[in-house]
Structure formats: C-alpha cells, structure tokens
C-alpha cells in the first residue's frame, strides 16, 4: 500500500495527488466521516480478485490492514470494527487517556516482519502471519480461519470465543500504550510486563461482558482469578513480612503474574474503571510513567476520594506510616472488607488443604520453585500468619 505521511503542523490544505499505474486497495470504512462512498458489494468483489495483497477496514478509532488471503473472514466488517472501536474506547477509559485520539490505532499482518517479537511497539502494530495463523508463504495464500487471534473474536461480545493467543496480543499492544507503572523505586519488580494485561482485562469485562473475576482469569496465562491471585499473594514471604512484593528467594514476584495487576482489577471491580483511569491520568498530567509506590497510593486515593491504602497493602504494596497519616481523612475502603473476609476464608487450614491449594496453583504458575519449597516445608503456623495479616488490614479500614 501507498500512504502519504503529512508532518505535524502542516497546513497545506486540500491537495490532489495522482499516481500512475496504481491499483486501488479494497477499502471499507465504518467511520461516519469516511463512509460516504462505501459499497460493501464492491469491497467484497475487489477482495475476491486478489489484485493487491491487502485490504483495509477503517473504524472510528481503529484501522485494520490484513492480507487478502483472509478477506473471506471479513465480508461483514461492521460488527468487527464496532467491537474494536469499543475496545479502544474502553482502553482509553482505563488508561486515563482522552476519549478523542489524535490518530487511529492500526494493526497489520505480513508474511515477514522486521522484529523478533510479535506485535512490537510500533505504528502500525505488525504481526507475522505464521505466528497468528500458522505456515503461510505469501499474503495472498488462502487462510482458512483467523488463527490464534483476530478482531473477529470480539464481535460476538462473549469471552467464549476467545482463543489462546488473545491475551498475548493485547499484552504486546499494551506496551505501546506505556501505562503508568508502579514499583520503579523498588528496583526490578518489572511490573511493566504485568500492567499491560489490563488491556485484556478491561476489554473482557466491558466489551465481552465477563464478570471481573473471569476477565482477570482470562487476561493472563496463569488461569488465576481473584481467589487464586490472593492465595498466590499470601504465599509470598515478602507479603507475610509486610514488605513490598518484588523479588523473593526464587524469582521476580510481579513480572507477568496475575497478582500484580489484580490490585488494579480489584479497584476497578469495587469502584469502576473510571477510577482506575483517574489514577493513571494524574501521572500523565505530571509527565511521567514511573509511578512511585507511595505517590500511587496517595494520588490514586485522592482521585478516587477513598483511602485505597488497604487494597494496595493486601496486593503487595504496603503503605508507609506517613502515607497512612496523610490519607486518614479520606472515606475508608469499607467495600474491600467483604473481599478480605473472602480471601481469609480461602486460607488452607489443614495440611491436606494446604497441599491441595499449592498443587492447584503450581499447575499453571509458570515457575514452580517456590511451590516445591512449600510442599517440602509444611509449616502449620503459616495459616495463622496469613490470617493475622488480613486481620490487620481489616482493622486499618474499620
């Protein structure tokens, strides 16, 4: 395809450009300002001829440039692009970004891309065909289905049609959004590999109509909902010692792990995604994506008009005494007490329950060293340690 790049600040007005020998790319727009000459029949017929390697669909907030070998999957683009536009809108709310974007998000696939990573941080987002749909030699080859991920997955407005690669794609696209990220001063927590999963979480919850627990579970690879993420958190030696969860004796405690972005999903479930957006927005407004933990708790609580310190405390980011004092005048997070009681009830009481919980979490954790340690070193006092920590957090709310 041939695109014209207009430098920022240009004021050239309307200009006619003539290109000899060009073949029109099949294009369809669902955007109100661009669909005056749309003809769905013409679009589908042009795709069938395969005169050019790609077709393009433009939405209000999203552009899709896909190989013509997949065109038979997009003969009815309206519901697909409607779902993608809505997804971009939901991401904007979560991220604290303006509702009106300065340009549309853009996704394309090609047989070869100049990156070892799928969907690298770029404009457009590039995906390699073989990583999405399997072995394909050229973009004109007929592709039977939409492969590991496609915007088609969203059109049904249900998580039942999601494929295994969906959260991976949103993870990579999340890096392009450069979300404000906590834990920088703690060192190597690397939560930038975790909060990118918030894109999938908000889309599954707001666009695909999943409850927040299901959205959290499906947004990462561990298959952890709130209960599993809470148990994973409580089995952290750092958490048991009331220390910031970052790195333990075995591995990073936050990178790629559901318990890292569960704290934000918890806030969204209790107070709404708009509150999450307000937390993120304050960091954009001061011009940084590096969120210090105490600043996050302080400014986030003030934007939410509720003392969020207990939520951060439970999910591995304990507030300092100074932070607690400064937030004492805000309304308490009483909505969180019921959740804490639920997490307390999940704590295993007997050795049999203890081993059952660990084996379940171990099955999908990704790294097993910590779980093997706990299996080999049963401590009957551990459940009391966990309960005491939760009781202290509940007391801080009351």
Regions found by a protein language model. Give the residues of each.
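Catalytic cores of extracellular degradative/oxidative enzymes
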Residues: 42-46, 53-269
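Extended acidic/polar, glycine-enriched regions
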Residues: 1-51, 56
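Generic alpha-helical secondary structure signal
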Residues: 75-82, 273-277, 306, 310, ...
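Active-site-proximal alpha-helical
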Residues: 225-324, 332-335, 342-344
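Generic structural signal of hydrophobic/aromatic residues within well-ordered alpha-helices
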Residues: 28, 36-46, 80, 84, ...
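Generic detector of isolated residues embedded in canonical secondary-structure elements
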Residues: 3, 195, 310-311
């Amino acid at each position: 395809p041939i695109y014209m790049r207009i430098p920022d600040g240009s004021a050239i007005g309307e200009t006619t450009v003539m290109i000899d020998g060009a073949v029109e790319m099949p294009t369809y727009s669902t955007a109100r300002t661009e669909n005056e000459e749309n003809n769905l029949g013409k679009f589908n017929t042009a795709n069938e001829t395969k005169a050019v390697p790609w077709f393009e669909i433009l939405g209000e907030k999203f552009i899709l440039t896909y190989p013509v070998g997949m065109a038979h999957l997009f003969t009815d683009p309206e519901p697909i692009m409607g779902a993608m536009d809505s997804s971009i809108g939901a991401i904007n709310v979560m991220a604290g970004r303006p509702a009106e974007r300065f340009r549309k998000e853009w996704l394309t696939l090609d047989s070869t891309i100049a990156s070892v990573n799928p969907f690298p941080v770029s404009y457009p987002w590039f995906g390699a065909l073989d990583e999405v749909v399997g072995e394909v030699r050229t973009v004109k080859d007929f592709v039977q289905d939409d492969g590991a991920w496609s915007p088609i997955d969203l059109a049904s407005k249900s998580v039942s049609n999601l494929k295994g690669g969906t959260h991976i794609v949103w993870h990579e696209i999340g890096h392009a959004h450069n979300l404000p990220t906590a834990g920088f001063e703690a060192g190597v927590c690397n939560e930038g590999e975790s909060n990118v999963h918030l894109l999938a979480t908000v889309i599954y919850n707001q666009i695909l109509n999943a409850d927040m627990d299901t959205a959290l579970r499906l947004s990462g690879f561990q298959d952890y909902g709130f209960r599993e993420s809470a148990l994973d958190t409580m089995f952290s030696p750092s958490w048991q010692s009331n220390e910031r969860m970052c790195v333990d004796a075995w591995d990073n405690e936050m990178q790629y792990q559901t318990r890292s972005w569960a704290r934000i999903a918890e806030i969204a479930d209790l107070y709404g995604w708009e509150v999450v957006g307000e937390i993120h927005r304050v960091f954009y407004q001061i011009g940084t994506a590096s969120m210090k933990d105490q600043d996050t708790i302080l400014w986030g609580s003030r934007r939410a008009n509720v003392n969020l310190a207990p939520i951060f405390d439970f999910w591995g980011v304990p507030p300092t005494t100074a932070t607690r004092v400064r937030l004492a005048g805000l309304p308490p997070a009483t909505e969180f007490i019921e959740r804490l009681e639920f997490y307390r009830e999940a704590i295993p009481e007997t050795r049999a329950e203890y081993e059952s919980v660990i084996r379940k979490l171990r099955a999908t954790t990704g790294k097993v060293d910590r779980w093997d340690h706990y299996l080999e070193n049963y401590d009957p006092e551990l459940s009391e340690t966990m309960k005491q920590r939760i009781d202290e957090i509940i007391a801080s709310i009351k």
